[in-house]
Amino acid sequence: VGSEMCIRDRYKYSGTGSSGTIAHGLGSAGAIPKMIIVKRLDSADNWCIYHYNIGNTRRIRFNSNDYYGTGSGYWNNTSPTSSVFSIGNSSEVNSSGGSYIAICFCEIAGYSKISSYVGNGSSSKPPFIMTGHKPSFILMKRWDAADHWYIINNKTIGYNDANYGVYPNLDNNEYTGNVYIPRIYSNGFTLNTTDPQMNASGGQYMYMSIGQTLVGSNNIPSTAYWYG
């Protein structure tokens, strides 16, 4: 387990075609995976992602802008534990003889956050997403409707409002417009837009945020703070 990667561990496994469990190493840190990314290596198939806010009956595909799919074939309708995660019989996660890689993520307080938020459709008073750290990397996706994945970082330019992003499910170049640019603070971020990709009224969004190197007495660099 590497704290520098927000607490993630990687595993290769062979599919059996029957539901079962895969051991992970995050339990050594007392952690339960909140996000799992699975990809078949030996044959063309979709990326398959578990996110605990979406639940153990659903999955999101990394290579698509689709909303969630439902079925026991993905996670066997079972949430991860501190020692294993479950898989069903879908070819995306468990075809007999298939070769797979799984990347499991959990949280470290003050450094990473895996959670969700609900949009309010307001650009003047958007939702503030509390992460407990200053985000350096944010992966997000609307999961209740079709829309693109989006990755934001605060290093390309490094100041508000120029935290540009990319679409991991597309081959587009970096987006440098002003519609999808968040404001990053020492304890979270806001999405000052009404665009449904990030802030539809009532829209359901999942995200994973990773912070910068822990520094200071409170382990959070303070460059700006959101007071609401």
Annotate the PLM regions:
Residues 1-7:
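Short, small-residue-biased leader/transition segments that mark boundaries at the very start
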Residues 12-30, 89-94, 116-132, 197:
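Surface-exposed ligand/attachment interfaces on beta-rich extracellular proteins
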Residues 26-43, 127-156, 209:
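Beta-rich globular "head" domains
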Residues 93-107, 198-215:
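Extended Gly/Ser/Thr-rich low-complexity repeat segments
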Residues 130-145, 183-212:
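Extracellular low-complexity, Gly/Ser/Thr-rich intrinsically disordered linkers
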